[in-house]
Amino acid sequence: MDCYLLLLVSYVIFVILGYKKFELPIISPTMITLVSLTIVIALGYWYRYEMGTDLYFYTFIVIALGGGAILGTGYGIQRWAKLNWGDPTSIENNFDSNCYPLVGIVNLPVRYKYISMYMIFFILFSLFCVFINTTGDSDASRMTQYRDIILYPQLHPNDTRFVFINSQFYKIAWAITYVSAYVAIYNGVILNKPIFKGTGLLTIVIFFCIGSSIAMGARQPAIEIFIFMILTYLFLMVKEQYFDQVKRFLFKLIPITIISPFLYILYGILVGRHDGNNVTLQRVTELLAGGIYALNIHIWEPARTIYFGQSSFADVYDKLINFGLLPESARMAYHEFDKFGNTLSLFGRWYEDFGILGVIIMSIIVTALFSLAYEYLQRRSNGNIWTHVWTAIFLTELVSLVWAGYDDRIRALLAFSQFVIIGLI
């Protein structure tokens, strides 16, 4: 039995059922997660011969049950929301969205010129931090050193000058960029204004991508702002019932989606990653599908955890350790995968802690929280300022689900702060 093919077919069925039978919007947390995993599984299936192994049947069971739990929970929450909160259009029937431009509500005159000046300062200060904390003649080698300093500051106690200050400048730049993007996209969808032309948004985003890559030694912040912008556009388009435009936009995204992994790898050169010179389909597949193969390899020998939820709630334990409330031994010793990256796929951490039942339970909890927040925000009036605040926060969290099949950022979904944010929404 080809368990990998069986898994791929199962997830294709999940996506079709969710979109066609259950009528889940493509922007819903359930569909985002299932589509993300389906793409990753499809790449892994294509690459299975090079990997030299098939999936164990037990691995198929774990991932398939997790996907089924996500689909069932998403559909159940949608049905519950319609029965108890009504249809998403019911609150908006008498709502004239043209009377409620976001800029008018927030009274936020976005001065793109001043923002651009701050971004330039942020880039220059980040470069300053790199050059005073590293040595060498090559810019690439300096970035590699700086990235190592960012990741392991305890190993470089004398090479962290101004790094903390620059991290605060990064947070300011991050907040400014996300707010600017949300405001511009909102006014583009609701008021039919240009999103990029004449707004300066593209300049701000490009500056942020450059600055964040240098300051954090990572390419994720740059990629995630684009994912956030796409999610914001789709969320608002669905909320305004512009379904035909959504379909056209999704078709336009297909070629961008195809080339984006290659650009992601190439972008690694800027942040000191050695894989930036290996821009091949094989490398893309190793990155995106590696988590599934890693889970398959370690399915019988998961990482040994001592404390309850030590792998799943790693972020929570890290905070408690940093505050001195737990010993250093409580910190999760992650699996190291030189070839596959640092993830065990979406379900790996939950499986390490709680087994197959834990995968099902945690899939239900996370999907339910995100789906409830989504259904609630879809019914909130655009005339309420807090709707925009919570929508923007929710969409930043939703980015994690887009990474569901690949990146270890998924662990943040189980951090205590994420549950608090979604619960408050």
Language-model regions, residue ranges each:
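N-terminal "leader" segments that precede or initiate the main folded domain
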Residues: 1-120, 199-209, 225-266, 404-425
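Hydrophobic alpha-helical transmembrane segments
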Residues: 3-11, 14-22, 44-49, 115-129, 167-182, 186-191, 208-216, 340, ...
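Hydrophobic, membrane-inserted alpha-helices
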Residues: 10-15, 41, 180-184, 204-212, ...
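Membrane-interface helix-loop-helix junctions at transmembrane boundaries of multi-pass membrane enzymes
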Residues: 22-27, 184-200, 375-389
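Membrane-embedded catalytic interface detector for glycan/lipid assembly enzymes
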Residues: 83-217, 222-242, 261-273
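Small-residue-enriched transmembrane helix-hairpin modules in multi-pass membrane proteins
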Residues: 146-167, 251-254, 260-371
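Hydrophobic alpha-helical segments
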Residues: 342-425
